[in-house]
């Protein structure tokens, strides 16, 4: 089937979902925020090797706008900002884990990553 015949070309829920979480950094940001529970901007940036301040700030604004993370400002000097996952974000994580499992099973052996053991 060519992409012109695809029934997903108009108002596709999957396309909408990918517009919310697509891009190079959004899934990594969501996973980092969710794993931390609550995290400050600089701590989050430290977990994302290679991301610029501009890209991180933009992605965080989009994720907040789309209801996937909460932003809390604290009136202190210097100003403090924390990010936390929303309930929608928490519901998304098992789906991302399934997608990761699917992708890992399809990856060539030299590109496959080993899942990190969670501390007990």
For each feature predicted by the language model, list its residue ranges.
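N-terminal helix-turn-helix DNA-binding core of bacterial DNA-binding proteins
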Residues: 8-55, 76, 82, 113
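Exposed, interaction-prone assembly regions rather than primary DNA-binding/catalytic cores
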Residues: 113-120
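Basic, amphipathic "hinge/linker" alpha-helix immediately C-terminal to the N-terminal HTH DNA-binding motif
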Residues: 75-99
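Long, low-complexity, charged/polar intrinsically disordered regions in eukaryotic proteins
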Residues: 1-4
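Alpha-helical linker/hinge and terminal dimerization helices associated
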Residues: 66, 95-107
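Basic amphipathic alpha-helical segments that dock to polyanions
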Residues: 56, 60-63
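A short, conserved structural fragment
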Residues: 64-73
């Amino acid at each position: 089937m060519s992409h012109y015949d695809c029934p997903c070309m108009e108002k596709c829920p999957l396309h909408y979902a990918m517009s919310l979480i697509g891009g190079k950094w959004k899934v990594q940001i969501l996973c980092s925020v969710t794993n931390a529970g609550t995290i400050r901007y600089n701590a989050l940036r430290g977990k994302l090797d290679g991301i610029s301040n501009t890209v991180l700030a933009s992605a965080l604004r989009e994720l907040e706008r789309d209801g996937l993370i909460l932003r809390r400002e604290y009136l202190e000097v210097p100003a403090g900002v924390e990010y936390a996952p929303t309930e929608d974000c928490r519901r998304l994580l098992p789906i991302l884990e399934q997608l990761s499992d699917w992708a890992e099973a399809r990856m060539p052996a030299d590109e496959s990553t080993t899942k990190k053991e969670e501390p007990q």
